[in-house]
Amino acid sequence: MCRAMNKAKQLIDRLEAQHSLSIEEYEYLIENQSDELAAYAAEKAVALRKQVYGTDVYIRGLIEIGNICRNNCYYCGIRRSNPACDRYRLTEAQILDCAREGYALGFRTFVMQGGEDSAFSVDVVCHLVRQIKAEFPDCAVTLSLGEFSREAYQAMFDAGADRYLLRHETANKAHYEKLHPAQMSFDNRMRCLRDLKDIGYQTGCGFMVGSPYQTARTLAEDLKFIEEFRPEMCGIGPFIPQKDTPFRDFPAGTCEQTVYLLSLLRLIQPNLLLPATTALGTIRPDGRERGLQAGANVVMPNLSPLGVRKKYALYDGKLCTGEEAAQCIGCLSRRVASVGCRIVTARGDIIR
């Protein structure tokens, strides 16, 4: 045990210094995770985060614009084949009202997230982006609306979108095909990510921790992919089963493994924008604080209208107590301060 721990610590030291390991070395770190090793990685990750970002934590206002989706991902509560999902689609006026409320609360980044819905066509999305940028020129607009053509991504970028989040979900093609039906393509997902980066978006990828059929090897491949792709953002959170999906009976991912991987991601890329996600706060009450203590530096409170928050149910038990809401920025500030960080009102672009 002692020898394995020493080897693992040496790998973490090397990752801290060189920001790169082999897939086999990442796999070793994942297989030998322990409380002691996670604490060791977290201490180094927080030190690196402080070198780049100080104690600043950036806030993003999340606007869940609709839960209608053409896709049928096996893990997702808003999948097309879920008849139990209470569908909604926000109007342009509702979306702009969310942004106005967020701006008044101090948000300078808005994240428009939703299912792949043909009603939110390229033209509609471009119009929304232009409206928000015209009213709030000092704000960043992030989109998280799934897969489009390169031309569509270019049009949204030209309309003023700054960032795009598209979780890759897994860097292993065989694993991807176990999480998604045959109509969905691993190669197309990767094409989208390359196009986004090439166009000039600040690009975010990410994956679920503990998803069905995930192994130490596939996770190691995720870390290597992120090391090589160099995204501006990376969103990871525990897999949480949703009762109306084919994966309802699979166990959830753990907070412990998620925060350990957050630390490794910070060591891989010290300037990464790394959220402590809502899923982490769902799986344990202090999950987001644990994420910040492991190296995260972004939180994404919910600006969606209260009436729809429960409907955007990607997984069961989603935090909808009010504490995760943007309106409770005071509570959030105190929680962030409790772990030695501070929320800042800023666009929160990546520091290069």
Regions found by a protein language model. Give the residues of each.
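Auxiliary Fe-S-binding modules of radical SAM enzymes
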Residues: 1-34, 103, 227-352
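Conserved, mostly hydrophobic/aromatic
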Residues: 18, 45, 73, 112, ...
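An N-cap/entry alpha-helix motif that binds or orients negatively charged groups
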Residues: 20-57
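Canonical Radical SAM [4Fe-4S] cluster-binding loop centered on the CxxxCxxC motif
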Residues: 53-93
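Glycine-rich, proline-tolerant flexible connector loops at the mouths of alpha/beta enzymes
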Residues: 60-63, 83, 111-122, 174, ...
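Active-site-proximal loop/turn and secondary-structure-junction residues that shape catalytic pockets
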Residues: 63-65, 116-118, 145-149, 170-172, ...
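Core AdoMet radical
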Residues: 80-96, 102-123, 128-193, 202-209, ...
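Catalytic cores of alpha/beta
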Residues: 149-156, 212-226, 282-293
